[in-house]
Amino acid sequence: MKSSMLGRLEQLAHRLIEVDALLADPDSAGDMDRFRRLSRERAELEPVVLAFNAFQSTQADLATAQEMLADPEMKAMAEEEIKAARERIEVLEGELQVLLLPRDPNDGRSLFLEIRAGTGGDESALFSGDLLRMYSRYAESQGWRVEIMSESPSELGGYKEVIARIDGDGAYGRLKFESGAHRVQRVPATEAQGRIHTSACTVAVMPEADEMNDIVINPADLRIDTFRASGAGGQHINKTDSAVRITHLPTGLVVECQDDRSQHRNKDRAMQVLAARLKDKELRERQSKEAAERKSLVGSGDRSERIRTYNYPQGRVTDHRINLTLYKLQQILEGDLNELTGALLAEHQAEQLAALGEDI
């Protein structure tokens, strides 16, 4: 192992001891923001330090086995132990390399999920509803909370556009590679001839912005319009201008929220979504530049890129970025996404390791 890597691991082991001491301090419990920040840091440090401890322990076992070589009666056993220890050290070094890769500071955040119907008309809108259900089921399986922020329903079901907030630790890190064009191939319910139609939806996964630090929005850059909400809403609908449309003049980004009966809450929601979109815009510009430099397959930030096809007749899902095909369409649509998200994360880590090798 390189001395620079060893030094970094020793620093992290020492930092874990410091964090544990700070968490045990009664003052930390009185400051919930500080306590949460330290708890999150500890959760990030612990797997690295545990792997490092295992690495050091295996190195000690190797040294002991090498000393045993001098004893003729113990030589055969020592050689076996040396072989096993060296193999274990190689595995642990690989794990530690991955654990030390630069972390996306947004990985631990909650996210905004935006799904828009694209080509395919009503069938595309129906598929956007299927995608929302898929991600909602996955979020539930992870213990995350899903809240609809804004929706534009289609007459036949599904959505022309829907924005949801998924609230949970690590939500963005797990779902960030879902951004892009999702294509569906199936026979629509309205198709009398049984012909397969192709339609598509665009998915955007945006990390929730930290209002204090991430994005500064100048009120002078905003045009805020209020209007009467449309759609289902019972006796209160169309009686007050509760719906809000916010336009960010420098970028032309527009956010509408009308799902709540309170204008104030609709404005708050619209501002949250706008902040996330502005943060996402910055991220995508940076990712696009990095992807061009590294020829990255995953995480390029290109929303127009067709990333996945859901083929109903064949019961398959294909992710085109990593050439992965799974014949478990129904399970995936029910929220069983771990195999997909895990493969995408592994590919991203492989790209990072390759880039690290180029930089050394």
From Swiss-Prot:
SUPFAM superfamilies recorded: Release factor
UniProt superkingdom: Bacteria
Compartments, record wording: Cytoplasm
Major site of localization recorded for this protein: cytoplasm
InterPro entries in the cross-refs: PCRF (IPR005139), Pep_chain_release_fac_I (IPR000352), Pep_chain_release_fac_I_sf (IPR045853), Prokaryotic/Mito_RF (IPR050057), RF-1 (IPR004373)
Post-translational modification: Methylated by PrmC. Methylation increases the termination efficiency of RF1.
Positions carrying N5-methylglutamine: 235
HAMAP family registered for this protein in UniProt: Rel_fac_1 (MF_00093)
Family: Belongs to the prokaryotic/mitochondrial release factor family.
Name of the molecule in the record: Peptide chain release factor 1
Organism phylogeny: Bacteria, Pseudomonadati, Pseudomonadota, Betaproteobacteria, Burkholderiales
